[in-house]
């Protein structure tokens, strides 16, 4: 829809459903930030997210019915699937902890995916097309869908880590607890170096940070749990991809650009989990590692695809 032809949009229900989901998320976005400033989660935001997820579900089912194959074979379909997975992950996380910070952190990701798919991609990349012979395999659903869901979980978890950094900004908070955020010993370090456990009588500037401690710990725990799920799914996705590659091309690993960046992504999040489980890190330092992972996923998924390089690329600049 590079030229944004309104007639072609209204005649194509798949594109129309995507735009409807975009409109709902766009409506929810300012509401998310208002809820953060108000300090309370909003049932209206969750309702809009739920409706957008239902619209994306209907869009994917309709494209599946139209094309006759699982709708994840081109960049438009994979972006819509990623938006669906991001909104679903966000809803599941908010069910665990209904905080406005979750919606404010994660909603822009789903919105950005749909916006890029609907307004930036050329028309030929938005249309359903027959699968190439190598993709006509039952591994398509197993490998690609698991990888995309892992990306969604890792993206949402990393965005929650960014929220940890934003919450702790300028307050020098350091969280000390178990890897799942329970039984925490939390301390604040003042500019002069004074340290106090939360809840213990201390200087006024330390007492004022108790709410931020609780918020940071919740965000940090949710980020850790979400990233753990995403990491496990990414591991399964990489292994299933290796098996599929061996069947299709006779090689378990070919150092294709997407494979290489997927490995880099796996190593970054493995380092994140290592720092938490083995080193006992929590709070800002692992959040910085997760933020690096956010950049790596964007390069792995969008950067490689748009350059049209390798067997995994959907193409754009060089072969569109």
From Swiss-Prot:
Alphabetical list of InterPro entries matching this protein: Cyt_c_assembly, Cyt_c_biogenesis_CcmC, Cyt_c_biogenesis_CcsA, Cyt_c_biogenesis_CcsA/CcmC
Organism: Synechococcus sp. (strain WH7803)
Chief site of localization: membrane
Keyword field: Cytochrome c-type biogenesis, Membrane, Thylakoid, Transmembrane, Transmembrane helix
Subcellular location: Cellular thylakoid membrane
Chain's role: Required during biogenesis of c-type cytochromes (cytochrome c6 and cytochrome f) at the step of heme attachment.
Record NCBIfam families: cytochr_II_ccsB
Cellular-component GO terms for this entry: plasma membrane-derived thylakoid membrane
Gene Ontology terms for molecular function: heme binding; heme transmembrane transporter activity
Entry's transmembrane regions: 14-34, 68-88, 101-121, 146-166, 226-246, 260-277, 289-309
Protein name in UniProt: Cytochrome c biogenesis protein CcsA
Membrane topology term: Multi-pass membrane protein
This protein's encoding gene: ccsA
